Amino acid sequence: MAGASVKVAVRVRPFNARETSQDAKCVVSMQGNTTSIINPKQSRMFLKASFDYSYWSHTSVEDPQFASQQQVYRDIGEEMLLHAFEGYNVCIFAYGQTGAGKSYTMMGRQEPGQQGIVPQLCEDLFSRVNVNQSAQLSYSVEVSYMEIYCERVRDLLNPKSRGSLRVREHPILGPYVQDLSKLAVTSYADIADLMDCGNKARTVAATNMNETSSRSHAVFTIVFTQRSHDQLTGLDSEKVSKISLVNLAGSERADSSGARGMRLKEGANINKSLTTLGKVISALADLQSKKRKSDFIPYRDSVLTWLLKENLGGNSRTAMIAALSPADINYEETLSTLRYADRTKQIRCNAVINEDPNARLIRELQEEVARLRELLMAQGLSASALGGLKVEEGSPGGVLPAASSPPAPASPSSPPPHNGELEPSFSPSAEPQIGPEEAMERLQETEKIIAELNETWEEKLRKTEALRMEREALLAEMGSPGGWRTVGVFSPKKTPHLVNLNEDPLMSECLLYHIKDGVTRVGQVDVDIKLTGQFIREQHCLFRSIPQPDGEVMVTLEPCEGAETYVNGKLVTEPLVLKSGNRIVMGKNHVFRFNHPEQARLERERGVPPPPGPPSEPVDWNFAQKDWLEQQGIDIKLEMEKRLQDLENQYRKEKEEADLLLEQQRLYADSDSGEDSDKRSCEESWRLISSLRDELPPNTVQTIVKRCGLPSSGKRRAPRRVYQIPQRRRLQGKDPRWATMADLKMQAVKEICYEVALADFRHGRAEIEALAALKMRELCRTYGKPEGPGDAWRAVARDVWDTVGEEEGCGGGGGGGEEGARGAEVEDLRAHIDKLTGILQEVKLQNSSKDRELQALRDRMLRMERVIPLTQDLEDDNEESGLVTWAPPEGSEAVEEAVSNDHSPAVRPSSPPQSSWERVSRLMEEDPAFRRGRLRWLKQEQLRLQGLQGSGGRGGGLRRPPARFVPPHDCKLRFPFKSNPQHRESWPGMGSGEAPGPQPPEEVTAPPPPPNRRPPSPRRPHRPRRNSLDGGSRSRGGGSTQPEPQHLRPQKHNSYPQQPQPYPAQRPGPRYPPYTTPPRMRRQRSAPDLKESGAAV
């Protein structure tokens, strides 16, 4: 039995009254064990899955394919009960949306033929026990009943239990509930009574605390023990089986159920439990399919999964029943349930027989002896010869131990068996150090467990009887006479009474309150019928039962002052005569139906017509609530419209705030043409859409988003004509290096929802699936993550579909289509996507290789430019010496050296820079644009010179000249590098291709050069760029005939004083290499030379 898969069955129920009133259509079909569901909006799209059992209960009993309660039990219940007798742990749990039929399948009704799996299994259990019981074989049965509500555990069989119980995990026993009552039973009647008592306690607690039973998980556990005596060895062995019958809470959405406030919080806790259960099932399925690298299973994330740890993927034989609604209005919930069940099929449980290890060893040896005997007899050995082996087998050296020498009991150090196997013993030194308080608590808990294990069967029966008496006293105190024998099963034939109504059919009509002759008081203190709750007063109301002369008993309801009491939805302030079938609401949560059997019989005999109203609708909790809302003047439709309007106004307000924030961020970051604005818009849109989706269904979300629009930064978006290779995305609030697959899935969901919303929700399911596959592959490659499981994109597409839904009216008809049409279309689309993705990857690789080549060439060019000026500068340093000055002082000896190195006959005269300083000062004062540009340029030059001085100080005597300036890509030239004629002459200029660096000093008395010739400059640190205006033969071949203006002398300034002042001389030391002018300055400086040349010509 080890390694068996979980049994999965699906069952579809008939239409209920709400679905019938809305003219719902059936979208679920079954053929054999295959179940199919069709999308009501796109009939060609359907889901088909195969399960172990598919039960069609949508029609009536006359249908030959109809699955009754007995058939469901024969297929699932009998098999699980057989495993329990074999010694395995067993679990059956039902899952589905609210109202899908889980409680009916598990519990059923009291009518014959309507009982569910739990009553039938319990009845069949005791039937087999009575048949198989003998002197060598005995049985014992213990039961417990608990409820998990909002992650709190309550004991439903112990009236003294107050509050929630604590869930703990023992290293040997596994997870268990501390102080949970475990009651001994001897017959099916005892179990039925305990289940009724548990349902009553559940109903009372739910009504008093304003809870809904469909929002709580109920776990009914049966501990079945088999004790056998082996006559051969004289040993007693036990096999213990735990049967867990779980009725999960209904899975529902806040928008479909209208949950708000506390109901929404309850739903969040239920969704937490069910979501954790789904995570556990997915993790176990991935573990079986070898898709999961880690063995961690999140059992402890919720109380439900923690308690079901052994039943899910552990030591248990498990079966799941998925309850389905056939209506098209519940398509999304039904589809989710089917996917849930399909994942559960992949789980495999390793179940073992729970028995003593010695007994197991003896059993295995006996089976071996029997097999060898059959083998010897098959070979022709007589039975008389085999009989002589018994003495040898009983000897110490034989196969079986002798009866006179039973095996020694296990030592205290060896722990009891767990799941049929011995756990390794833990030495005290291996255990972690614990504090004294924890040690004392653990000691008390261990002593309590030992006391429960050593408790005799008679003591357990006495404990069960004591708890039964306490429950009877509690029910009598509440005003429910008749005890536990009649409540919820029998109703009085003549006495008027009240029957409770509840949203859950399992908890409805299980509490009965008699109205005695005379006065029956209702309230919280000193009353006959005790109710508790926020809106129940100490003296709430009273019932007067007065016999009439004709024998009829008339019951009158008299409310107390200030107490809220409603009859058929109307507030009662004066005494009112009750009729059989009236709906009574006391406070806000206690709903009852008044039954008067004798009055109803007399009316039928008199032929009194029934009261007006729909005769087919039963008088249940929904009918009472609807009646109460209508009489109170509360129109549900108007309330929903008002709520939608409020949500729309809130969305508009948040959108305006998001628009303002995005506009501020765009202006601050100055990224109108980048993609940062789109990223921020995507995040804000996802925030608003997800918050709106938590409150409303997808179609309503689409309507509001279409009407109000999406958040935008004001940037005009150009339509994308071709697919663009995406840039690297930034995950919000997380380092991309630590991004997980869940983060990538969430990012893909955000981007796809944003694109779908931008396209006015025109995407169909196939397009969303294609986008999901492309986005996931794209994100995985971008962040260097493995693509992981092949169905990761399916989860993304499902989340997108659940968030944005489908456009209203799209996906029209077209009939049923062929069975594999959708699959073929998806495969073709996926192949096309793979092809496009491959092309994009090749283009990306080519672009990256070209970028690498360009970068290598750029680095090589920069290295060459650094080497060439350094060689020329070294030659100049060997020839020149002296101080480097920025302004040419008089009487400098370096002039002669400069003249000797120059091939020109004369040296250029030096002119005082007074005119240049005056012009610069005038422009600085008059032209603000010139002032800003010059200050910006000077700041850059100061930073450059500081860097040169710092590197020169560290490098010693020689220093490499700065490399040629390479402007960044797509960088616009800013002022002062503009072709403005009035600014050109203000910049200190120099000869063609000469850098404005430090020059050797010149004599003032040197003769001027000839006017018709410009001497060539022997010192050029580098060759100008070919595209510059001062480079090439045009500036060097045809020299200018005009003498060089005085304001074109090289000049450097650190400040802008009002009067021109020469720069002080530098400190003596290693001279600096000539300064290399950026290309932009040379292009601007060449313009005056061109003008002079043109004027001369």
UniProtKB/Swiss-Prot annotation:
Residues 520-587 form the FHA domain. The keyword Coiled coil applies. The modification Omega-N-methylarginine is found at residue 1036. The modification Phosphoserine is found at residues 294, 491, 671, 673, 911, 1028, 1086. It comes from the Eukaryota. Gene3D superfamilies: 2.60.200.20, 6.10.250.2520, Kinesin motor domain. Disulfide bonds: none annotated. It is found in: Cytoplasm, Cytoskeleton. InterPro entries: FHA_dom, Kinesin_assoc, Kinesin_motor_CS, Kinesin_motor_dom, Kinesin_motor_dom_sf, P-loop_NTPase, SMAD_FHA_dom_sf. GO terms for molecular function: ATP binding; ATP hydrolysis activity; cytoskeletal motor activity; microtubule binding; plus-end-directed microtubule motor activity. The modification Phosphothreonine is found at residue 1077. It holds the Pfam family Kinesin_assoc. Residues 1086-1097 have a biased composition (Basic and acidic residues). Keywords: ATP-binding, Coiled coil, Cytoplasm, Cytoskeleton, Methylation, Microtubule, Motor protein, Nucleotide-binding, Phosphoprotein. Residues 5-347 form the Kinesin motor domain. ATP binds at residues 96-103. Residues 397-434, 897-921, 946-1097 are annotated as: Disordered. Residues 1016-1026 have a biased composition (Basic residues). Residues 404-418, 997-1015, 1059-1077 have a biased composition (Pro residues). Belongs to the TRAFAC class myosin-kinesin ATPase superfamily. Kinesin family. Unc-104 subfamily. Probable motor protein. This is Kinesin-like protein KIF1C. It comes from Rattus norvegicus (Rat). The gene is Kif1c.
